[in-house]
Amino acid sequence: MATIFRTWSYQYPWVYALVSRLATLNVGGEERFHQLPLENLAISPGQKVLDLCCGGGQATVYLAQSGATVVGLDASPKALGRAKINVPQATYVQGLAEDLPFGEGEFDLVHTSVALHEMTPAQLQSIISGVHRVLKPGGIFALVDLHRPSNWLFWPPLAIFMGLFETETAWQLINTDLGSLLDQAGFTVVRKHLYAGGSLQVIQARANKTVN
């Protein structure tokens, strides 16, 4: 059943949009959802931002509003085609999140929105290491993704959602301590906040590295 609904959500943009709207109601809607990982970040013109796994540009638009130079990366040419229409002021690169085609210390901020739960544990490790590599010293990795609920009332809706639209990797992520993985890769978590009964996590982590 998950395969059918996942296929529909990727094949038909209106299905994906509907699911996104419904899934973000518990944090105040899509706009609020996409702003959560960016709170208290001073993004400004002159900075360079990577929107990792940007999809159709749903979050890219909020990054672009800052006036920063925004690059969106995604593995899907179809998704990138939609992103170019939705957010033409950004530039786009087709590539894999676990094999970032960028140089050392190229970005001030790397952002990703509900993408890490699509990755295997090995891919997740590679992504975190790659993000650390492409960030400038002191650069920020900002993310929002699924989390194991702390309030039992949120288990049924999360389980239904994951059963319909997600795969085993989503279950693996909610049982993974992202903070520890980030720490091991050379980050310091400067902010972590849980929303929707603990079913969503927002993390901002600073890259600890020196200028070469």
Swiss-Prot record:
Entry keyword set: Methyltransferase, Transferase
Name of this chain's protein: Uncharacterized methyltransferase sll0829
Molecular function GO terms recorded: methyltransferase activity
Signal peptide per UniProt: none
Gene3D superfamilies cross-referenced by the UniProt entry: Vaccinia Virus protein VP39
EC number: 2.1.1.-
GO biological process entries: methylation
Uppermost EC category: transferase
Pfam families for this protein: Methyltransf_25 (PF13649)
Homology family: Belongs to the methyltransferase superfamily.
InterPro entries per the UniProt record, alphabetical: Methyltransf_25, Methyltransf_Superfamily, SAM-dependent_MTases_sf
